[in-house]
Amino acid sequence: MRLSRYFLPILRETPKEAEIISHRLMLRAGMIRQEAAGIYAWLPLGLRVLNKVCDVVRAEQDRAGAIEILMPTIQAADLWRESGRYEAYGKEMLRLKDRHERELLYGPTAEEVVTEIFRASTRSYKDLPKNLYQISWKFRDEVRPRFGTMRSREFLMKDGYSFDIDQAAARHSYNKVFVSYLRTFERLGLRAIPMRADTGPIGGDLSHEFIILAKTGESEVFCDQAYLDMPVPPPSVDFDDVAGLQGVVDAWTSHYAATDEMHDEAVFAEVPEASRLSARGIEVGHIFYFGTKYSTPMKAVVTGPDGSERPVHMGSYGIGPSRLVAATIEASHDEAGIIWPDAIAPFDVALINLKVGDGACDTACAEIQAALETAGLSVLYDDRDERPGAKFATADLIGLPWQVIVGPKGLAEGKIELKRRASGERETLDPVDLPARIRRL
């Protein structure tokens, strides 16, 4: 993609309303634009990142045996009355009526809808377990939306829901998602720490938040530093191995970890002083087991092995891809701009032509772009008629993992320059060696 033809409305000045670094950088890098309080348009660069985050989330959900569906955003109020949550949810839920005066709502979550889908189509324990998920836009009318896409009113959410015959089976489904989330965040270049959490309006008696550490995090967290080096299960992890999966979850919940809401100073004091870590953190995922909280009032039942009907045991599991984009920036940036992990960078390579119009530079850049794309790498080619300093500033701001710098001096010696954005390391090499060099690193 040539930058001269791309839609990248970069801002030179930081908008005054942007309070945290991710919001500032997403606006400056032309990733998003605000349309109303807490509501954003995703522009091409931001959408590429968002789609890549969704691809990783989707791949790990599928690996764990979850099945993707898509449910309506506009939901019937009667379903929420049936579960008992219509009045309890409060003003965060946007309520409306259609032309026939039927009461509807803009779904902030989908436990009721997925339970209705399940009960209408599943009758026997032989059809269990099931884990259904979707990736869709949600709306919660926050009193004070702030921090850009970190706490917006409209947001993209992966919400999953499991159905099992009993508590033991439901706990295995919970563990599957627990491990899949560890793998998801690892692939996104994030170290997420699971912490016991309050179940809030979702309900239930078992819940974990997944928290990444960041200086600008919204929550204070307390944990054992052992979490920073714990191994994440590999792609070969067997999600059907009940005991093995429970062992992974036990290992990842054996050390102290709590947000300020759940913090117990006396228990934390038992952690060796050298291992205690107090920091700021950002919630990037939340999982719940809530038993029969929804299935009982909504009569989501199956026939068990003994022939009697029983309500299914359920769990729900959330990751916010739009929030994850901002959280990644909070955890990975410097004074010059964003530093994208390879897995979700909008492009792999920023190709910088230092002298547009120079025959040798133009030809070399065209050949390099073709070679990189043939090797499966995505390239954003800065072919604008701008000063080198402006091009370097743009490349650093948008944070692509690699910068390939082509100028007349280097080409006179048959060389180009390669820079790694994360480390700042530079090297010179022959253009023909470039694709293999990037692939190897």
From Swiss-Prot:
- Provide a GO biological process annotation: prolyl-tRNA aminoacylation
InterPro entries from the UniProt entry: aa-tRNA-synt_IIb (IPR002314), aa-tRNA-synth_II (IPR006195), aa-tRNA-synth_II/BPL/LPL (IPR045864), Anticodon-bd (IPR004154), Anticodon-bd_dom_sf (IPR036621), Pro-tRNA-ligase_IIa (IPR002316), Pro-tRNA-synth_IIa_bac-type (IPR004500), Pro-tRNA_synthetase (IPR050062)
Q: Enzyme group, top EC level?
A: ligase
Q: Which domain of life is it from?
A: Bacteria
Keywords of this entry: Aminoacyl-tRNA synthetase, ATP-binding, Cytoplasm, Ligase, Nucleotide-binding, Protein biosynthesis
Q: Name one Pfam family in it.
A: tRNA-synt_2b
GO molecular function annotation = ATP binding; proline-tRNA ligase activity
Gene3D superfamilies in the cross-refs: Anticodon-binding domain, Bira Bifunctional Protein, Domain 2
Gene Ontology CC terms, in alphabetical order: cytosol
Query: Is Acetylation among this UniProt entry's keywords?
Result: no
Subcellular location per UniProt equals: Cytoplasm
Q: Indicate the principal place this protein occupies in or around the cell.
A: cytoplasm
E.C. designation(s): 6.1.1.15
Catalytic reactions on record: tRNA(Pro) + L-proline + ATP = L-prolyl-tRNA(Pro) + AMP + diphosphate
Q: Which NCBIfam families match?
A: PRK12325.1, proS_fam_II
User: How does it associate, per the subunit comment?
Assistant: Homodimer.
What does this gene product do? Answer: Catalyzes the attachment of proline to tRNA(Pro) in a two-step reaction: proline is first activated by ATP to form Pro-AMP and then transferred to the acceptor end of tRNA(Pro).
Q: Which family does it belong to?
A: Belongs to the class-II aminoacyl-tRNA synthetase family. ProS type 2 subfamily.
What name does UniProt use for this protein? Proline--tRNA ligase
Annotated organism of origin: Methylorubrum extorquens (strain CM4 / NCIMB 13688) (Methylobacterium extorquens)
Identify the coding gene: proS
